[in-house]
């Protein structure tokens, strides 16, 4: 039986999100956010771009309602448009945190799911050679979509002096932790081919006085001094490797030092984005991955106490334990 009054709200919402995505892609192709870091009329923008003024007005109005552009009315009744703070920081080519256009090409989620249906999970072995410059830069952009921001916002490092960031990769977590906590100094430990990117970012963000880098892995790492915090972000999908890593991390810590464990889990929160994250990760490896309890149990089993949840969002949890 057909109920014609049953509206396809969920379907329409998804299709409308896709429209917003396409609008965002067009605005990036035009480099609008760099051009309107200062207020500009649609007419002036039309002249510089060679694009129809009315089209640009409608585009800017759509971007204004999305929250990426601010409209300012002048005393003469005309409108000027300026990039909103979030667009200036992440979508302007002049920003250090510019996300680039690659993030906004056709996403890999569809390709990933299609490949899983046709071929099953990837059997690729993640060895040290996997961690190329390209992969590290890709993870850097992904981290800027919320991972770094939420970690810096929710992880409390007040009073801590020395942070060890194992597998710190691009280095953004340590760079911005030390920017928030001026007395904190960080040491990033990662593979030799990865730290090329790490050092570039340390220089880019002028963090050389706060962040050091060591080439190597945690198996052979022999620090001369203890740390009072260790940060681990998605460093391993293996339960055995996780326990080994936590055991080693404990030896690197001074008494009452803390380990901060940030990881994807299949039961982070009950929102749609966590469900999407879980689906993607299963399609990538054919394994369900960690649950929250796996992390807290691993922390307790390796001698950490005061195990607490710090933050949960979009398939990720941050938990903390004390030596």
Where are these regions (language model features)?
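A short SAM/SAH-binding and catalytic strip from SAM-dependent methyltransferases
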Residues: 228-242
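N-terminal accessory segments
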Residues: 1-111
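Conserved beta-strand signature within the Rossmann-like core of class I S-adenosyl-L-methionine
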Residues: 256-264
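Conserved class I S-adenosyl-L-methionine
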Residues: 159-169
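A short glycine-rich, Lys/Arg-flanked "PGG" loop and its adjoining helix->strand segment in the class I
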Residues: 243-255
């Amino acid at each position: 039986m057909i109920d014609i009054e049953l509206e396809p709200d969920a379907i329409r919402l998804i299709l409308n999100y896709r429209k917003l995505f396409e609008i965002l892609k067009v605005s990036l192709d035009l480099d609008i956010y760099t051009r309107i870091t200062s207020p500009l009329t649609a007419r002036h923008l039309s002249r510089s771009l060679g694009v129809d003024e009315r089209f640009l007005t409608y585009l800017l109005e759509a971007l204004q309602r999305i929250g990426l552009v601010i409209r300012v009315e002048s005393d003469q009744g005309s409108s000027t448009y300026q990039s909103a703070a979030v667009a200036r920081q992440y979508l302007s080519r002049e920003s250090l945190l510019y996300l680039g256009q690659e993030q906004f090409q056709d996403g890999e989620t569809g390709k990933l799911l299609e490949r899983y249906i046709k071929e099953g999970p990837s059997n690729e072995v993640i060895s040290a050679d996997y961690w190329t410059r390209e992969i590290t830069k890709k993870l850097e952009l992904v981290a800027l979509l919320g991972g770094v921001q939420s970690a810096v916002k929710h992880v409390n490092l007040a009073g801590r002096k020395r942070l060890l960031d194992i597998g710190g990769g691009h280095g953004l977590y340590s760079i911005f932790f030390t920017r928030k906590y001026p007395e904190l100094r960080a040491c990033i430990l990662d593979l030799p081919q990865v730290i090329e990117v790490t050092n570039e970012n340390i220089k880019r963000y002028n963090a050389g006085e706060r962040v050091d880098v060591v080439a190597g892995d945690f198996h052979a790492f022999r620090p001369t001094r203890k740390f009072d915090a260790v940060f681990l972000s998605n460093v391993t999908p293996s339960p055995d490797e996780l326990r080994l890593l936590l055991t080693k991390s404990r030896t690197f810590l001074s008494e009452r030092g803390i380990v901060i464990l940030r990881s994807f889990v299949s039961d982070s929160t009950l929102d749609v984005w966590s469900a999407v994250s879980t689906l993607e990760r299963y399609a990538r490896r054919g394994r369900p991955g960690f649950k929250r309890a796996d992390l807290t149990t691993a922390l307790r089993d390796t001698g950490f106490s005061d195990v607490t949840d710090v933050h949960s969002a979009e398939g990720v949890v941050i938990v903390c334990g004390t030596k």
